[in-house]
Amino acid sequence: MSTTTNKKPIRVYVDGCFDLMHFGHANALRQARELGDILVVGVHTDEEIAKNKGPPVMNEQERYKAVRACKWADEVAEGAPYTLTEEYLDSLNCDFCVHGEDISVGADGKDVYEGIKKSGKFRFIKRTEGVSTTELVGRMLLCTKDHLQNVSGEQTSPLGGVNPNVLHKQSPYTSLSHFLPTTRKIVQFSEGRSPKPNDKIIYMDGGFDLFHVGHTEALKQARALGDYLIVGVHDDRVVHEQKGSNFPIMNLHERVLSVLSCRYVDEVVIGAPFSVTKDMIDSLHINVVVHGDDQVVLGPEGGVDPYKLPRELGIYKEVKHTEGLTATEIVKRIIDNRLQYEARNRKKEAKEINFIEQSN
């Protein structure tokens, strides 16, 4: 007789702000999910974040939706407390809490997981090097985007006069670092499911920079049109040619991992061509090509419509933009509140350094 048939599922809890939800967050959820059967994700309110850390870039409703779109999140606990208690963990029927190696300090300067650690219901997971919300805000504030310099040969930043020393590099958790892409990470994020012979295959492409709820809602609609969703992610040069200025904020590998973490996505074409070609349609067995209902940006070579062929074949469809959010809008939020976010990053780092010094 098997002893596993009536085994109680292990419920794992992880919490956070999940501001500017990125592949580092997704990787934490992936690792946490591997430790049990059901992953419950607690997301803090705007008020809690402002009190303990500084103002979030994305509001709580946007952050709740972003977490729900991650394929490793089974349940979302909205309005989770910033300082976790054993009572709250028990109220969710969770067996233990998981957090990265980086420290999390509350408004009082104390470790927010201190009580849970003492209770023995705490597990560590590895932090994803080279990406954090603070780091992404730093890129937008200081334009420390090596990948963009390589694409365009120059920086064209509206914040070109910002002092690069505004964000210090002393805390190991709040430094500007570099994500090193590996094939293993792509495999870990990939679904690994192949389309079935009779599956209706949907294709949607784009830059997917600063992957946000506007993207996930569009992908959800696209996936509903068929059985298998393939997403084409444009390379850095294509995104820069179309968006100009400081885009993309995130490089190709970072954007690919963000898209792969989405529960509506089955497969990703890395560095997809700007125009949808006959070869692509034939080789990927595409039945429907999807784009948002915003204006299609024409290609640089004589103003070519990238969806000309799908339109002619009668396989082109549009989905509604329901969120009204773009990467440009997110960057604008940062720039409009630049001083607030610079202060937030400094405050966060200062608390971390102080905590490290007191712990040593």
From Swiss-Prot:
GO biological process terms on file: phosphatidylethanolamine biosynthetic process
Annotated InterPro entries: CCT (IPR041723), Cyt_trans-like (IPR004821), Ect1/PCYT2 (IPR044608), Rossmann-like_a/b/a_fold (IPR014729)
GO MF term set: ethanolamine-phosphate cytidylyltransferase activity
Superkingdom per UniProt: Eukaryota
Record keywords: Lipid biosynthesis, Lipid metabolism, Nucleotidyltransferase, Phospholipid biosynthesis, Phospholipid metabolism, Transferase
Record pathway: Phospholipid metabolism; phosphatidylethanolamine biosynthesis; phosphatidylethanolamine from ethanolamine: step 2/3
Function, in words: Ethanolamine-phosphate cytidylyltransferase that catalyzes the second step in the synthesis of phosphatidylethanolamine (PE) from ethanolamine via the CDP-ethanolamine pathway.
Full protein name: Ethanolamine-phosphate cytidylyltransferase
Organism: Dictyostelium discoideum
Gene coding for it: pctA
